Design a protein with these regions (language model features):
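C-terminal domain-boundary segment and adjacent tail
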Residues: 49-86, 179-181, 196, 205, ...
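N-terminal structural segment of carbohydrate-active enzymes
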Residues: 2-12, 20-71
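Short boundary motifs at domain starts and secondary-structure transition points
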Residues: 17-22, 82-87
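Metal-dependent polysaccharide deacetylase catalytic core of the NodB/CE4 family, i.e.
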Residues: 25-37, 47, 88-92, 100-200, ...
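A generic local structural motif
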Residues: 16, 78-82, 134-137
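Intrinsically disordered, low-complexity boundary segments flanking structured domains
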Residues: 13-19, 138, 176, 212-216
């Protein structure tokens, strides 16, 4: 996992070297939250730490193009494992957490400009309920444009702290809602705040092929 502050000096050669030496998928996953240009002097220091400017994303994708780095999705990894697709020599996954409105307004145009693939992990209970998040129509547009939409639960709760019934709703209801909206299977899940326990792992394995966390 590569965090915002690490992107300034991003050099994932170690991942690719390991990938070439082993018969396994070892590739960097770049995690983004807000795609917005926010000054370092802002009072919202958490927002600043979790933000990445659109122009920096543009330059990062320029760098990828110059160095033949290919953004993939988890859907691509499934195709690679099944032998329907070839793994590029240099590959990364771009993942965007939460389904913020700026993913649609700021990240989407930059990704489309570079023909770059990405995965958007959506909090299923937010579209059309919170103006800070992308709408259902916008999520559908992202899916129609070829981006992968994954689940980030229904409410972004700490799943490890929930009772069994609520936990199942967060894991499976989020998948069902998103699939109903986009008309495609949801293959990937992102643990809210990276938190999970054995119960969470078991349920996610039942409903998804891939899961992403910030915790090893």
């Amino acid at each position: 996992m590569v965090w915002r502050e690490q992107l300034e000096n991003f050099s994932p050669e170690e991942h690719w070297t390991q990938q070439e030496e082993q018969q396994s998928f070892t590739l960097p996953v770049l995690m983004f939250h807000y795609i917005q240009d926010i000054p370092a002097t802002t009072k919202d220091q958490r927002g600043y730490r979790l933000s990445y400017a659109p122009q920096k994303l543009d330059k990062l994708l320029d760098f990828f193009e110059e160095h033949a780095i290919t953004p993939l999705t988890f859907r691509d990894l499934k195709a690679i494992v099944e032998g329907r697709q070839t793994l590029p020599k240099r590959a990364v996954i771009l993942s965007f957490d939460d389904g913020h409105l700026d993913h649609y307004t700021n990240a989407f145009p930059v990704l489309r400009k570079h023909h770059a693939k990405a995965v958007f992990f959506v909090i299923a209970g937010k579209p059309d309920q919170d103006p800070k998040f992308a709408t259902r129509d916008q999520i559908r547009e992202l899916a129609s444009a070829g981006f992968e939409i994954g689940s980030h639960s229904v409410s972004h709760s700490n799943l490890a702290s929930l009772g069994s019934k609520r936990l199942r709703e967060e894991v499976f209801e989020s998948k069902a809602r998103i699939e109903k909206e986009i008309g495609l299977p949801v293959l990937s899940f992102c643990y809210p705040a990276g938190r999970y326990d054995a119960r969470v792992l078991k349920l996610v394995k039942e409903g998804y092929l891939f899961a992403r966390t910030t915790q090893p």
